[in-house]
Amino acid sequence: MMYSVVRGLLFTVLVLNNLIAGANAPVSQPAKPTVLLIKKYTTTINGKSSELFKIEQPDGTWGFHGVKGQMFDAIVKNQTDKPTAVHWHGLVVPNDQDGVPYITQAPIPPGGEYHYHFPLKQSGTYWMHSHHDLQVQQFLSAPLIISDPDEVKSTKEVILLLGDFSFKKPELIFAELKHGQMAHMHHGGGMASVDGKHATPDLNDVAYDAFLTNYRTLKNPEIVSVRPGDTVRLRFIAGSAMTNFFINIGQLQGEAIAIDGQSIKPVKSNQFQLPVGQRLDVLVKIPAGEKAYPILAQGEGTSMQTGLILATPKATIPSMKEQADSTVGALNYDQELKLKAVHPLKPKSPGQTLLVNLEGDMMSYSWTINKQVWPHIKPLQVIANKRVEMVFHNQTTMAHPMHLHGHVFEVTEIDGKAIKDGAMHDTVLVLPNSTVKVQFDTDNPGNWMMHCHMLYHQEGGMMTLVNYKGVAMPPLTMTHEMHS
């Protein structure tokens, strides 16, 4: 009954939005709908049985692999006992397909289903995940890979979906954060304050029990078979709730070719940075000889690591440690400053500037945008068909990976340093006490979430809406009442 009421309340608003925003017409022949099952998944982590979520197709295929130019036509079936919805992170979709409960749709009730249908306009590495409650912490997520039919394919593709795991329920973690029980934990730094001006950087709020790659720890890592001479495309997805990662591909030479699904001019290295919510595509070539090649990700501010192993057929598989030899520090802007988009925005002066102040208080665990806590917000309003500059000013001692739904944006400036042809993103990391400027075109009308992708920062209030002028707003009070 409750879900019927919610759907009824949303119907009028969503119909009006669609009339104004317009629905994108199919660009390719429709295919038979793919069925995506949201289900409970039991696994063993550090010797203990743990129940998580998983999104897979009836034949066991994890997530979704599509082709640019075709239709995404999927029926999501909720086989759990919790309401949910699925957001297609990084994809530019019609607003009513964005998968945000109470904003673009009612939640999918237990035993219910929802049909998503939209054209695939992009290619690259994306991911799908719940936007309901704290379900991302329990791995309600999956890869979403879109191939480009015109792109030269690698010999092999390997997905690494990185996650942070706790034996505690996410609701308990958040309650402890709200009551200050984790406030002094800080693996990597000092105490956060309201203004952040006189405090040392804070790297971690949550003490995790393990980091996982594709649901597995390094005690039992996935072994991927490769052959000498293979070109392997590593698709890294930071599907973690709160953990930024350093990527280490060891003895292999990597070439980063895409960030957030968007092509970049190649950057060669064997170490990369990957903030929460971002994706990174790295090419590696397997040398001659029989050998195993660990591909590792170490959590920012910790010695904990995760990963998998690439191995030739006769290679000896090494045993891997979950603890690195040393603790790593904080992510920085070095990598971002090097990234250059293959297809940057066409030069155009912004017609509007939006100031996005990021504030927070670690003791009360309240996180705000322009001093507003979700859902008690005044949306950032834009006008269709304009170039918009968005200025993120982080006034806290924590980094915030800021994600804008339904759009891609270009990084144009970091701490006063202009960047020509900066990388195109849907998620950008804004470091403590720093400023990042981005630009995007308002070419996708609707109401779009914009939030920190640190799960407990988002839950603590660091979320808002970008509203296109003339598009009716959903009833935001319902998001709070129904969530409570």
Language-model features: where?
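Bacterial N-terminal signal peptides
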Residues: 8-18
